[in-house]
Swiss-Prot record:
Domain of life of the native organism: Bacteria
Gene Ontology molecular function: adenylate cyclase activity; ATP binding; catalytic activity, acting on DNA; diadenylate cyclase activity; DNA binding; hydrolase activity
Cofactor(s) named in the record: Mg(2+)
GO biological processes: DNA repair
HAMAP family reported for this sequence: DisA (MF_01438)
UniProt keyword annotations, A-Z: ATP-binding, DNA damage, DNA repair, DNA-binding, Magnesium, Nucleotide-binding, Nucleotidyltransferase, Transferase
Residues given in the record as ATP binding sites: 76, 94, 107-111
Residues annotated as domain DAC: 9-147
Catalytic activity of the protein: 2 ATP = 3',3'-c-di-AMP + 2 diphosphate
Protein name per its UniProtKB record: DNA integrity scanning protein DisA
Length: 357
């Protein structure tokens, strides 16, 4: 589901990467912060920014953390080139539209917020008194924090994620067994979707910490990748297995991702998004199409899995199919038919053994 993660999050992650510890940009901002002079930095010298600029002087010099620190001693804003490689202008007065709403109080932060909204550029405000770096982009406001604080929060989030993944594994193990026995209820499916989304929301938060930590986030990144190897893929395939026929599973995924915490914990709300009306979740038996389970068989391309599901419609019928029935499907020869039969048999055996442990 990562490619469908909300655009706002992706936009913020890209911004944080440019200002992560170890980058020249972060070094320059930290220098201004330590000097307690305050500052306003606009990332990008496009036409919209230049229209709002008044006064100041041209620099057109290569970006340097020490240059930006010296230029911040003046009252005006600093404008950098779009690729962040040049300091274009300094000591600029920014004159955004005063009718643009902002909830900021200080003059520097009000200006930064309005310029970001009006131009769509990233604007960074460094507070003189509060010792805080604030990033603005469109409606996004994000406060950069010290690496030690971020690292502590990231470690705490990893611990939470470990617990969530352990619960998800149990829920998935139960769903696997029910799928092989064709005894799945809507309640079991919704529980798996909810647990997957809970894990992915923590992953999104940790991704943000990793971007903000830069080089210091490598260990956290490795731990994250180890914990959530196939969670996203499985989550999407559950939705593809169970959403109503005429529905676009990608849009169902996006709808679930955009739900508030209260909404996605409401089982009936998830059920409705999946295309089921007001039906009792525990009493409604549903059969999977088989995308998720067949995708676990090694060396079977996804195009073949799609042909398989298209032909048999349900996992139950794929399990019951003979070698000859499988052989008739486009892209499946005798060798693949054997691989599918033995692969599903092994998966069923593993599922039963895990349940007994």
């Amino acid at each position: 589901m990562n490619d469908l993660r909300l655009k706002k999050d992706r936009k913020l992650l890209e911004i944080l990467k440019t200002m992560a510890p170890g980058t020249d940009m972060r070094e320059g901002l930290e220098n201004i912060l330590r000097a307690k002079t305050g500052g306003l930095v606009v990332l990008g010298d496009n036409e919209e920014v230049m229209k709002l600029s008044d006064g100041g002087f041209k620099i057109n010099s290569e970006y340097s953390a020490s240059y930006i620190y010296e230029l911040a001693k003046m009252d005006g804003a600093i404008i950098l080139s779009s690729d962040l490689k040049k300091i274009v202008r300094a000591n600029v007065q920014l004159v955004p539209d005063s009718s643009i709403p902002t909830f900021e109080t200080g003059t520097r932060h009000r200006t930064a917020h309005r310029v970001a909204k009006q131009t769509g550029n990233v604007v960074v405000a460094i507070s003189q008194r509060r010792n805080v770096i604030t990033i603005y982009k469109d409606d996004i406001k994000y406060i950069l924090r010290d690496s030690s604080i971020i690292l502590a929060r990231a470690n705490q989030a990893i611990q939470t994620l470990e617990k969530y993944v352990a619960v998800l594994d149990r829920v998935m193990g139960n769903l696997n067994l029910l799928e092989f026995e064709d005894l799945c209820t809507l309640h079991d499916v919704v529980a798996a979707i909810q647990r997957t989304e809970m894990v992915m929301r923590v992953v999104t938060e940790i991704d943000r910490y990793i971007c903000e930590l830069g080089n210091e986030g490598r260990l956290i990144s490795m731990q994250l990748n180890e914990l959530v190897k196939n969670v996203e893929q499985d989550g999407m395939l559950i939705i593809r297995d169970y959403c109503q026929n005429e529905m676009n599973y990608s849009k169902v995924c996006e709808t679930i991702q955009s739900m508030s915490s209260e909404e996605f914990l409401n089982s009936e709300a998830i059920s409705k998004v999946m295309g089921y009306g007001d039906v009792p979740l525990i009493d409604t038996l549903i059969s999977p199409r088989g995308y998720r389970m067949t995708s676990k068989i090694p060396r079977i391309p996804f195009i073949v899995i799609e042909n398989l599901v298209k032909n048999f419609k349900e996992l139950k019928k794929i399990l019951e199919a003979s070698h000859e029935d499988l052989d008739k499907v486009e892209g499946i020869g005798e060798a693949r038919a054997r691989a599918i039969k033995s692969g599903l048999r092994k998966l069923k055996e593993q599922t039963i053994i895990r349940k007994q442990l």
